[in-house]
Amino acid sequence: MQNISSRIIFIRLLASSLVVMLLFVLSLLYGSAGWSWELENWSSAIFWELRLPRSLMAILAGTGLALAGFWMQLLFKNPLASPSVLGVTNGASLGVAFVTMAAQSIWGYNFPELTLLAAFAGSMAVLLILAVVRLRLNNLTSLLIFGVMLGHLAGALETIFQRAAARNDLPNLIYWSMGSFSKVTMIQVLWLGLSLAIVIFIVVRNHRSIDIFSLGEQIAVSMSISPSKVSNVLIFCSGLLTAVITAFCGPIAFIGLAAPHLAKLWWPFRTQLKLIPAVAITGMVIALFCDVLARFLDLPINAITSLIGAPWVMWWLYQNKTQRHG
C-alpha cells in the first residue's frame, strides 16, 4: 500500500510539474501581439523585459498567495480565510489611493515608484496595527473580526480618497485595483523571490510547532508550544507575502482561498511541511493558467480568478453541506 501511495504521489508530482512547465512556456510565447514561435523573438527586449518577468511573477505570486491563504486557514481554523482576511490588501489599496490624490495635488503627477511604496507601506501599517492589537486580544476569532473591520474601514477611506482624486487619475486607480502581472520588473521578481525564501525558511524552522498548533491550542499548550508565538509567525509570514505581492501586482483575488483546498484534494499529505510544496505548485498552476487566459480573452486577471474561484467556493460549501447531511 505504501508503494502504491508513493507511486501515485510521484505520478502526480510529475504531472503537476509538467503542467507548470507547459503553462510557463505558453505564458512566454503568448502576448498582446499573439503567438510568437520565431526564435528571434526569444532574444528580443519584449521577451526579457515584459514576458519573462510577467511569467516569473505569476509563478512567485501564485506561490505566495497560495501559501498565505493556507496559513490563514490553518491559523483561524476557517476554510474560507484568505490572504485578504486581515485587511492587508485593503491597507495597500488605501495607501495607493491616498498617494494618488496627494501626488496629484502636490506635484501634479503620480510617480510609479510612489504607488509601489504606498501599497507596501499601507500593507505594513495594517500588519503593525494587528501586531499591537494582538497583544491585547488573545482570542483569534476576535483578531479575525478586528482584521475584517479594519479592512472595511480602509475600504471606506479608500473610496473617500478616490472621490477626492483628480478625474484623470481614476483610470490608473481602477486598473491597479484589478490586479496584473504585466508591469512588473525583474528587480521586483527578485525581491518577491527573496521574501518568499525568507518566509518559507521561517515556517520550515517552526514546522513542528505549527503541526502541533494545527491540532488545537490546548494540545499545543500541553506540549509546551506557545500558540501566540505560532500565530504571530503565521500572521507575519502571510502578511509579508500579501504586502509584497499586492504592492507589485495589485490585489489578486481567490488564489489564496482556492489553492489550499485544491492542494489537499490532489495531494494526500497531512503534515504542514509536506503540504507547503503541494500548495505552492497548486498556486503556480492557478496563477499561470489565469494569467494566460486573461491575456487570451483580454480581461483583467481578477475577472478570471473570480470566475474560477467563486464557483469553487460555492461548490465547496455545497459539498460540505451535503456531506454533513449525508
Task: Indicate residue ranges for each PLM-predicted region.
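Alpha-helical transmembrane segments in inner-membrane proteins
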Residues: 1-326
